[in-house]
Amino acid sequence: MLRNGNEGMSTIPGFSQIQFEGFCRFINQGLAEELEKFPTIKDPDHEIAFQLFAKGYQLLEPSIKERNAVYESLTYSSELYVSARLIFGFDVQKQTISIGNIPIMNSLGTFIINGIYRIVINQILLSPGIYYRSELDHKGISIYTGTIISDWGGRSELAIDKKERIWARVSRKQKISILVLSSAMGSNLREILDNVSYPEIFLSFPNAKEKKRIESKEKAILEFYQQFACVGGDLVFSESLCEELQKKFFQQKCELGRVGRRNMNRRLNLDIPQNNTFLLPRDVLAATDHLIGMKFGTGILDDDDMNHLKNKRIRSVADLLQDQFGLALGRLQHAVQKTIRRVFIRQSKPTPQTLVTPTSTSILLITTYETFFGTYPLAQVFDQTNPLTQTVHGRKVSCLGPGGLTGRTASFRSRDIHPSHYGRICPIDTSEGINVGLTGSLAIHARIDHWWGSIESPFYEISEKAKEKKERQVVYLSPNRDEYYMIAAGNSLSLNQGIQEEQVVPARYRQEFLTIAWEQIHVRSIFPFQYFSIGGSLIPFIEHNDANRALMSSNMQRQAVPLSRSEKCIVGTGLERQTALDSRVSVIAEREGKIISSDSHKILLSSSGKTISIPLVAHRRSNKNTCMHQKPRVPRGKSIKKGQILAEGAATVGGELALGKNVLVAYMPWEGYNFEDAVLISERLVYEDIYTSFHIRKYEIQTDTTSQGSAEKITKQIPHLEEHLLRNLDRNGVVRLGSWVETGDILVGKLTPQIASESSYIAEAGLLRAIFGLEVSTSKETSLKLPIGGRGRVIDVKWIQRDPFDIMVRVYILQKREIKVGDKVAGRHGNKGIISKILPRQDMPYLQDGTPVDMVFNPLGVPSRMNVGQIFESSLGLAGDLLKKHYRIAPFDERYEQEASRKLVFSELYEASKQTKNPWVFEPEYPGKSRIFDGRTGDPFEQPVLIGKSYILKLIHQVDEKIHGRSTGPYSLVTQQPVRGRAKQGGQRIGEMEVWALEGFGVAHILQEILTYKSDHLIARQEILNATIWGKRVPNHEDPPESFRVLVRELRSLALELNHFLVSEKNFRVNREDV
């Protein structure tokens, strides 16, 4: 993106920058703002006063390293010291005191809470201020309302009814007259009439009784309290009543905050100072004036678009952490007040540090944050599946969470793409399912204005001044500013020099797309990727795909498993390097120097006469059980520069993102094995470890003290267990490093002491107890066993001992997983499928040079899904493979000329055909296709087949974690039917349609078994199990199953008695029996 040296230069911002900027703002401003709000604590007699100062607070370096915090399940935090003053009589003490620990962000933009990486994602909420809307009622009459939203999220509504009276609705049920509200806020009737444009309307609706209620502020407050709190009877004005009203209403519904004050001033043309952050009577009257103007046609009928980004604000990590710090300080205030009372009772002399005791504060602060990270919906477990997920997770924007929308109640309009999202929020990248449109991702160039919370997008300014100076300045526009500019939508690449000669260009103005003359353009886009998120920007030829498939692709790239041998894509978009760099999975040299030595655990670097040790990550488990591993890439003795890659992480090659493999694919049907998105693969992918991945599982066990006070014991000496189950344990009873373990093997031996019950005593034990008073104790074996599907190699064992009786042992097991039938694979165009069969390579279709195909996809998956980008990618990938080239292609290349993508692909295929002297690579009759042969017979297929090299990913949805079977297991307490889910050892549901299918075949006995005996027939299911084990005949039962009993009881509740009868076959006698 360079033009004439540095003119018009623009760089992509750091993808994790938003998280770092937010946390820095919290540390530099947020802490000080909350400490300034901390009140001076005094006792009732004013003999003692305690105060915290916002200036000069200090954060110490964390006492533990990141790696140790993860292994020992601790929180990576820093101790906060604040200046405090205590006035006790005439004695004034100043002291710097510790008030607790604050979680610290690490280099990944995440937090470590109790050993787990967590991240705080950005929340997008309706901005505080006033919003007007008009809607028709059931009679077709327009109703106008104004909604005031506070900084806390509280809502109040102003409305005009049919009798032209103005009401304020302070909650869903209560509404009060606007005059009562204004009077309760401190205005008298004269002031109200002087400050409004329509005094005659205000005077028209109050009757004599209502006028009496607003004679004074006290009467108005009493009337307001009576209606707001729904209290009857005669009330007496008091200070406590005022305080309650202040706390319940004015603080929650009238605090606008800095952003709300700006929005209110802008919307109602007011000039109230910015530091006045509460709702004033003047605001309410101006808002009512505007509403009257809308109703009677003298104002502008402009409904506010609630979904426009100018009416939204971002609550970043800074705002959420600041809220929690304020909450913790509120708790600290109560704790200090209690301590002051205790000081007077004990008659001891206090100091600032004794008032802030460790039990009341440091625990208060850290527990507040740990509760926040553990329960708040926007504080999520950091997704570490691959480097892309680590980069993308911090850039998410969510409408969910406290004060936001919910998946079940959000409307279609709130989920839809809005023109103001252009260049700010990606129109493609969102979740599938119930939260579609509610969670999005920031566009790659977007940044957050942390002062106002708006999302800004960069544009090139091409005003007259900029043209005269012959320079292009990059300006960041907020959503409320770019409405006033003509923005050129197309031709957004700086390299396109011929843009000025074009007469007419597509442009965007006030949320409309127009075609206007180039001279009228004010600003233009700076980059073709500007509108997309990182996930969308990694899809080559995205302009040829349907948006729904692009959405699936951007989501599935985040599910790709890092492979044992990574390979970078032949066809990419150019953003792979930046994504890998910003994920921080690779080790980058922070200074220049010379490599002394390197191994799998560390790199030693000599720089400026110092030896620096750079630790590497070796087979560390991620949050998603994938393997995080760094491989050194610099030999001994090599001189390196600052910024050079020293070691590569998982799923990166040469500093670029490498999520999948380039494999030879053919689009053709093959014996029905690729019907409905199934995929046929060659055994080469298994035997040559093409799609082999490593996964690390963690198993842990903890010792505890029993209710009798006896401690559990970790030991190898476990009676009644076969020797081969204990073969991998060392003398301490813990599995040895490097052992190969199978399902059912003991990983950690543990015995839990138990006191034997009276009835279980043998005669000798009873004698010992009677004579010597000795208790006979027995131990129960409660060892940690390897569950089903956990076989693998033990790579790490952690023994964490906090006290003699509290021991935790963690065992990490590495699994090597080849690709197998049932695994899920996907391309970068939403083309996903399940492996249906692994064919011997000699049976796979082969090319004219004898190369067998690696994967066979169904060609019917392309036209209906409209993801033609995969065809371009596979054909260009084949050319790149033969020419030993890699391509990095920006999207929307059709802006240069028509059919630009197709021309590029065909020209490269032609070049490859010429260089390799293989005419079948490009055949003019059917370009991109080739005649291929059946591996089983050697005969050519009837039709030419599209072949190519596609970049295919292996996804984390693997059959090893899905496959499940059950003979017997837990049952639901209510229905007595098997529970659902693999984790609960649940059963397979036979639904309505499955029952129809079985009925269609007339299998009455199988249906009876499934619906009764194997499900909720309590007695029969036990007897059938015994009959199956002992090989006996399955008994017949006449009593009904539980679901039938439930039906009978439901009918009884409707006063319908149901009885069944037994008819004797011999004499057709009817015997009536109760159910």
From Swiss-Prot:
CDD domains: RNA_pol_B_RPB2. Gene3D superfamilies: 2.40.50.100, 2.40.50.150, 3.90.1100.10, DNA-directed RNA polymerase, beta subunit, external 1 domain, DNA-directed RNA polymerase, subunit 2, domain 6, RNA polymerase alpha subunit dimerisation domain, RNA polymerase Rpb2, domain 2. Pfam families: RNA_pol_Rpb2_2, RNA_pol_Rpb2_3, RNA_pol_Rpb2_6, RNA_pol_Rpb2_7. It is an enzyme of class 2 (transferase). GO terms for molecular function: DNA binding; DNA-directed RNA polymerase activity; ribonucleoside binding. The keyword Transcription regulation does not apply. GO terms for cellular component: chloroplast; DNA-directed RNA polymerase complex; mitochondrion. Keywords: Chloroplast, DNA-directed RNA polymerase, Nucleotidyltransferase, Plastid, Transcription, Transferase. It catalyses: RNA(n) + a ribonucleoside 5'-triphosphate = RNA(n+1) + diphosphate. Its main location: plastid. One of its GO terms (biological process) is DNA-templated transcription. It comes from the Eukaryota. It is found in: Plastid, Chloroplast. PROSITE patterns: RNA_POL_BETA. Its EC number is 2.7.7.6. Belongs to the RNA polymerase beta chain family. DNA-dependent RNA polymerase catalyzes the transcription of DNA into RNA using the four ribonucleoside triphosphates as substrates. HAMAP family: RNApol_bact_RpoB. In plastids the minimal PEP RNA polymerase catalytic core is composed of four subunits: alpha, beta, beta', and beta''. When a (nuclear-encoded) sigma factor is associated with the core the holoenzyme is formed, which can initiate transcription. This is DNA-directed RNA polymerase subunit beta. The lineage of its organism: Eukaryota, Viridiplantae, Streptophyta, Embryophyta, Tracheophyta.
